[in-house]
Design a protein with these regions (language model features):
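Short acidic-glycine-tyrosine-enriched beta hairpin
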Residues: 88-105
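Histidine-centered catalytic micro-motifs
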Residues: 64-71, 106-112
Length: 149
C-alpha cells in the first residue's frame, strides 16, 4: 500500500495541471452528492490488494454529503480548486499537490469551488465502510467557502 500511495503522490505532483487520466463516468453514487461529479475507479481492491484508489472530479459547487470512513481516507488533489471540511476544524483549501489526511470516522465533506472544478485521487484501505450522512446545504457550503478567505 505504501508503494501505491507513493506512486499516486508522485503522479499527482507531476501531472497537477494536465490529468493523464480520463475523468470517468457520471458518479454512480450521485445520490450522496450535490451537483455533478465524475468517478474513475483505478483499483477497487480486487485480487487481494488492500487499497481502493479512485479519481473523483467535482464540477463547481458540487460536493459530497457529510460522511465518515471507518478507516479514514487520503485525498491527493490533482487539479482545480476546492475545499475539504472536517467537522470541528478549519476548512482546508484543496489545490494541486495538497495531500489531505482524513482520520478514521471523522465527519467531513469535499467539494469543488464556487466557480472552479476540483479533481482528487481518493485512497482508502479496504474494507472501509463509508457512512453517508446529511446533505451539505447551500448555506453551509457558502459558510465553509468563507472560511477560506
Amino acid at each position: 500500500m505504501k508503494k501505491t500511495i507513493l506512486t499516486l503522490g508522485i503522479t499527482a505532483v507531476a501531472f497537477s495541471q494536465d490529468l493523464p487520466f480520463e475523468r470517468g463516468e457520471i458518479n454512480p453514487y450521485s445520490k450522496y452528492f450535490t451537483g455533478t461529479t465524475y468517478l474513475n475507479t483505478f483499483d477497487d481492491a480486487g485480487g487481494g490488494r488492500s487499497a481502493n484508489a479512485s479519481l473523483v472530479t467535482f464540477e463547481p459547487c458540487s460536493r459530497t454529503h457529510w460522511h465518515t470512513h471507518e478507516k479514514g481516507q487520503l485525498l491527493i488533489i490533482l487539479s482545480g480548486e476546492g475545499v475539504v471540511k472536517i467537522e470541528g476544524q478549519k476548512a482546508i483549501k484543496a489545490t494541486p499537490g495538497a495531500i489531505i489526511k482524513i482520520d478514521s470516522d471523522a465527519k467531513h465533506f469535499h467539494a469543488g469551488g464556487k466557480t472552479t472544478q476540483m479533481a482528487h485521487i481518493s485512497v482508502m484501505g479496504m474494507p472501509n465502510k463509508t457512512t453517508w450522512l446529511e446533505k451539505v446545504s447551500d448555506e453551509e457550503f457558502e459558510s465553509v467557502l468563507r472560511e477560506l478567505q
